[in-house]
């Protein structure tokens, strides 16, 4: 068994693909740098992430894949699932070797796997856009927090920056303990020192942190939500399918 160890970054994965072709040795397993090696292995290659190699591989993939298929690579990577790295490696190798495009060849298990995984991430991104609820803080920053299944926040920045260009905001991922802050000029990545703070657990800011009118707006939104609800048309099963229960604690109207 041939093992490649890399730094668990997307750039490291692209470098691993470059190294495999250069060495004419392809890994049976990709591991993070500190992961224990399997008992039965024949060769271990330490991948050193290299910007030049990464750029060359990405340019090659850009020539052989459509923009949509190229984006699916990023979506798959952001799934952070255990199988994503090896799945992407096999897929990119097939793309490199194929004389024509393979992105529509869903009979291939790796092509199908990349499509299905990227779709799951895309669906989760859309849920974040749909269900993000902002709370206005006392310092006039709009704060939104969620706990998405996948690491989709990097895929939402453009939307929030465009949609709320005239308002400072923070979106925070409670699962991965990081977020983004927009100061009306730039978007920067942030973290909170106390990852166990109460508002990170239940998704609601304490009253003393809120703008003086925030509670009034929240009550108004709840009243509107309940007033437009037609009791005779309630369908709890469909409601939970369209609005998964795992998001409810972050929704003002479900408080």
Locate the predicted segments by residue:
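Internal, well-folded beta-alpha domain core
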Residues: 101-195
């Amino acid at each position: 068994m041939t093992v490649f160890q890399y730094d668990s970054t997307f750039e490291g994965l692209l470098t691993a693909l470059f190294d495999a072709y250069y060495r004419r040795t392809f890994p049976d397993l990709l591991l993070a740098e500190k992961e224990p090696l399997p008992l039965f292995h024949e060769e271990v290659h330490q991948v050193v992430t290299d910007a030049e190699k990464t750029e060359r591989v990405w340019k090659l993939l850009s020539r052989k894949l459509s923009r949509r298929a190229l984006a699916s690579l990023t979506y798959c990577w952001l799934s952070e699932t255990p199988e994503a790295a090896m799945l992407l490696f096999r897929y990119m190798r097939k793309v490199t070797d194929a004389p024509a495009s393979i992105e529509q060849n869903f009979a291939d298990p790796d092509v199908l796997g990349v499509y299905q995984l990227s779709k799951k991430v895309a669906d989760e991104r859309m849920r974040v856009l749909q269900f993000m609820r902002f709370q206005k803080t006392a310092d006039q920053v709009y704060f939104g927090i969620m706990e998405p299944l996948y690491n989709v926040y990097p895929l939402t920045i453009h939307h929030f920056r465009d949609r709320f260009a005239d308002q400072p905001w923070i979106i925070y991922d409670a699962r991965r303990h990081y977020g983004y802050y927009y100061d009306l000029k730039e978007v920067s990545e942030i973290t909170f020192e106390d990852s166990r703070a109460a508002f990170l657990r239940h998704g609601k800011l304490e009253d003393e942190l809120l703008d003086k009118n925030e509670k009034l707006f929240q009550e108004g939104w709840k009243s509107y939500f309940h007033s437009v609800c037609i009791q005779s048309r309630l369908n709890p099963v469909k409601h939970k399918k369209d609005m998964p229960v795992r998001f409810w604690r972050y929704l003002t109207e479900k408080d």
